[in-house]
Amino acid sequence: MGNCFTKTYEIPITSGTMRRPASTAERSKARGGDEPGTWRRPSFPRHGAPPHRPPTGSSSAAGALSRRASGGGGEMGPVLQRAMVSVRSLYQLDRKLGSGQFGTTYLCTERATGNRYACKSVSKRKLVRRTDVDDVRREITILQHLSGQPNIAEFRGAYEDNDHVHLVMEFCSGGELFDRITAKGSYSERQAAAVCRDILTVVHVCHFMGVIHRDLKPENFLLASADDDAPLKAIDFGLSVFIEEGKVYKDIVGSAYYVAPEVLQRNYGKEADIWSAGVILYILLCGTPPFWAETEKGIFDAILVNQVDFSTSPWPSISESAKDLIRQMLHRDPQKRITASQALEHRWLKEGGASDRPIDSAVLSRMKQFKAMNKLKQLALKVIAENLSPEEIKGLKQMFNNMDTDRSGTITVEELKVGLTKLGSRISEAEVQKLMEAVDVDKSGSIDYSEFLTAMINKHKLEKEEDLLRAFQHFDKDNSGYITRDELEQAMAEYGMGDEANIKQVLDEVDKDKDGRIDYEEFVEMMRKGIQT
C-alpha cells in the first residue's frame, strides 16, 4: 500500500472472535480479501485553553503584526486552535491509499516542490467527544516531537479546514513489513536481526524521548522503498502517550497478538513495547505468533499463562542466541524484561552484523542546527521556549533527564556525549565540545533545562505566529515594529554576545532591505529558514 497511515488489520481489543493464525499463508489470505480494516483514531495531548496572544502595543505597526498573528482575521480551527488552511492550496490530493472509520489517506503532491507525501484526512464529524479531539492533538504533538528520527516516518504538518483535519507525512513506497513477512513466510536469522535492530531502535528512541508507542506490530512498520535493504519506518502513533514519571497506565490498548500481559492486568509502562517487539521477532523467525487461540479471550489467557514454544519446527534449527533474546524480551515480569538499549547490545544482534550506517538522531540534528544559527535567532528561540505550555514540551523533560544521569539539573559535556551515543550518533569529543559551547548560552560550562529546551525546539513549534510575534516584541522594546541596531545590541549584550562582529553578522543576514533595522517579515523569514527537524 505504501502510505504512512495503514489500515489496522487487528483483532479489536474489546470484543469479537478471531481465527487462529496457523500459518503465514492463512494470515496472508485473510488479509488480502475483503476483510474490513478500521482506522485508528488519531491521538494527542490535552491542550486546554486557546493560545494566549500577547499585547501588541499602540502603534499601527504592532496592530498589523497582531492581525497577521491571528491569521489575517481567518477563522480559527477548533481542533488545531489556529487559523484554518485549505490543504488543497498546498497539496494536490491524488489517488486514495486507504480508508477507515475516521478518515481517508491519499497520496498527495506538494504544489511548491512536486514531492510526494501521504495525507490522512480525518473527518471532524467523527470527532464527537472532547477525548477524540484530545487524541488528535496528542498524536500530532508526538509526531512533531519525534520529527527527524531516521526510523520514524517524517511528519510534514497538520492542517485544518471546515470539514477535516489533515496530517501530511512521508510517503513510504515499499509497503508494510506485514506484507513482506507474509510473502517470505519467515526470515533468515541475519535478515530478522536487521529488521529487529530497526524496530528496537525505534523503541529505544521513543523511550529515550519520553514516548510509549503502545501499538507495535508489523502493520505499523513500512518500508521506505521497494529495495530489499530499505529501512523500516514506524507509523501510527494514534495510541501513543508521553511518559509521565510515576504514572501507571491502566487502559487496555493495542492489538491482540502483541499486547503484553501487564497491559491485560491494567498496570503497565514502557516495558510493554519491548514485549510487542519480542512478539514481532518471534513471528519473523517462524511465521506465527507465540500466543494464539480461536477467540480473543483465548489469546489473552495464553499470553497470561502459556510458555513460549521453542520445541516445534523451525525452532530446533534456530540459534540459542536468538531464542535467548526472545526469552528476555518476553519475560512476564516487566521489571526483569530487557530494555531496548540492552537488547540492541545483545550478542545475537551483534552477531547478525551491527549496522555501520551513521545516524544523526533528532537531538544531534537539532543541536547542529542551533549551533549554525545567528545569535539573534538563538535568543529568539529562547524567548519562545520560555513561553511554551507544559503540553507543548511533553517528552522533552524525559529526554533531559535521560541525559542528566547524575540528576544535577544540568547536562555536562560527558553526559551529552554519552546521551548522543545512546541514540546511535557517532560524534567526536571535539564536535561534542563545539555543540556544548553553542547550546550553553550563559557560558556556565553545562546545559541547563532552559538551554536544552531552546536547542530542541523543532520546526513545528514555529508555525504559530503568536509565538513569533511574542519573540519579536521581546526585542522591539519601543513597539515601533522594528528591531533597531540599538535594541539588537542591548539584547545580545545581556548574554555577552553584543560585540560588533555578531551584530554585523545578524544584520547582514537578516536585514534584507538594508535599512539598518529588522522588520517583522524579515524576522519571521529568519526564524523559519533552515530548520529541518
Swiss-Prot record:
GO BP annotations listed: defense response to fungus; intracellular signal transduction; positive regulation of response to salt stress
UniProt binding sites for Ca(2+) 2: 440, 442, 444, 446, 451
Keywords noted in UniProt: ATP-binding, Calcium, Kinase, Lipoprotein, Membrane, Metal-binding, Myristate, Nucleotide-binding, Repeat, Serine/threonine-protein kinase, Stress response, Transferase
Active site: 215
A single MF term (Gene Ontology): protein serine kinase activity
Domain Protein kinase: 91-349
Biased composition (Low complexity): 57-69
Cellular localisation: Membrane
Entry membrane topology: Lipid-anchor
InterPro entries: CDPK_Ser/Thr_kinases, EF-hand-dom_pair, EF_Hand_1_Ca_BS, EF_hand_dom, Kinase-like_dom_sf, Prot_kinase_dom, Protein_kinase_ATP_BS, Ser/Thr_kinase_AS
Pfam short name (any one): Pkinase
Residues engaged in binding ATP: 97-105, 120
Gene3D superfamilies: EF-hand, Phosphorylase Kinase, domain 1, Transferase(Phosphotransferase) domain 1
Region (Autoinhibitory domain): 354-384
Positions of the EF-hand domain: 391-426, 427-462, 463-498, 499-533
Binding site for Ca(2+) 1: 404, 406, 408, 410, 415
EC number: 2.7.11.1
PANTHER family per the UniProt record, alphabetical: SERINE/THREONINE-PROTEIN KINASE (PTHR24349)
UniProt record similarity statement: Belongs to the protein kinase superfamily. Ser/Thr protein kinase family. CDPK subfamily.
Function: May play a role in signal transduction pathways that involve calcium as a second messenger. Functions in signal transduction pathways that positively regulate responses to low-nitrogen. Functions in multiple signaling pathways, positively regulating salt tolerance and negatively modulating rice blast fungus resistance. May promote tolerance to salt stress by negatively regulating NADPH oxidase and positively regulating reactive oxygen species (ROS) scavengers.
UniProt name for this protein: Calcium-dependent protein kinase 12
